[in-house]
């Protein structure tokens, strides 16, 4: 099972929160104290809470569940995409479009348009168009790919969303709440833990911290998926003795 140690978290700077004047009082139970005007997060809480979240994600993946990685702020977007791709899951790394979950029917139409344009760009359709029309379609394709590229093969709503930056992604969290989709999220000292099923109190700005979260979640998802494949192989290879 994928687990993260106290040492891993200390080295990644997970314990460094925001300046004390920006704190959210709802995070008080997870704060150890303050140093030089910066809140220090109590890793005695974070370590078991993160490991519990990893076990949950691994379990979802072991049942062929879909994990949606969400992180659209600059510090998180690259790591979010890399981690999701590495474990064959899904991501939103550019901008959360309102209704991405709650208005899935409409989003599905946009994904269909994206796939149609992708086909046209490959099969030579673009070459038969006027320069202006080809340019317009290329721009539309790029725009759709940026917004929906990470979910174009998701084929339905996710079974869990994993969020870096609860404050920044509050719309995604609210949509998941409305649909009863579990939320796993990194919550810094300036954010609210409301609406989050698996809270990970921690630094949501430092690259090393973000990489620790994303890579650990990707590893947990892969472990769960491999467990599912192993069970499948065992079932397929099982022959009843006569």
From Swiss-Prot:
Its GO biological process annotations read: translation
Task: Tell me which GO cellular component terms the UniProt record holds.
Answer: cytosolic small ribosomal subunit
Organism superkingdom: Bacteria
Q: Which InterPro entries match?
A: Ribosomal_uS2, Ribosomal_uS2_bac/mit/plastid, Ribosomal_uS2_CS, Ribosomal_uS2_flav_dom_sf
Q: Does the keyword Membrane apply?
A: no
S-S pairs: none
**Record keywords:** Ribonucleoprotein, Ribosomal protein
Q: Which GO molecular function terms does the record list?
A: structural constituent of ribosome
- CDD domains tied to this protein: RPS2
Q: Which Pfam families match?
A: Ribosomal_S2 (PF00318)
User: What family is this protein classified in?
Assistant: Belongs to the universal ribosomal protein uS2 family.
UniProt name for this protein: Small ribosomal subunit protein uS2
């Amino acid at each position: 099972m994928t687990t993260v140690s106290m040492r891993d978290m200390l080295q990644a700077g997970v314990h460094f929160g925001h300046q004390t004047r920006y704190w959210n009082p709802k995070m008080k139970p997870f704060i150890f104290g303050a140093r030089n005007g910066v809140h220090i997060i109590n890793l005695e809480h974070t370590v078991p809470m993160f490991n519990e979240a990893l076990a949950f994600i691994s379990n979802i993946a072991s049942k062929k569940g879909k994990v949606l990685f969400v992180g659209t702020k600059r510090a998180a977007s690259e790591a979010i995409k890399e981690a999701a791709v590495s474990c064959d899951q899904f991501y939103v790394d550019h901008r959360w479009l309102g209704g991405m979950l709650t208005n899935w029917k409409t989003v599905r139409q946009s994904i269909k348009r994206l796939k149609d344009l992708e086909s046209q760009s490959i099969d030579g359709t673009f070459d038969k168009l006027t320069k202006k029309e080809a340019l317009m379609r290329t721009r539309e394709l790029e725009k759709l790919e940026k917004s929906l590229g990470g979910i174009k093969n998701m084929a339905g709503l996710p079974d869990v969303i994993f969020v870096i930056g609860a404050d920044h992604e509050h719309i995604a969290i609210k949509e998941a709440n409305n649909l009863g989709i579990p939320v796993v999220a990194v919550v810094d000292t300036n954010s609210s833990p409301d609406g989050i099923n698996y809270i990970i109190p921690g630094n949501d700005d430092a690259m090393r911290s973000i990489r620790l979260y994303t890579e650990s979640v990707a590893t947990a998802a892969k472990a769960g998926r491999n467990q599912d494949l192993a069970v499948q192989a065992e079932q397929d290879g099982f022959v009843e003795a006569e």
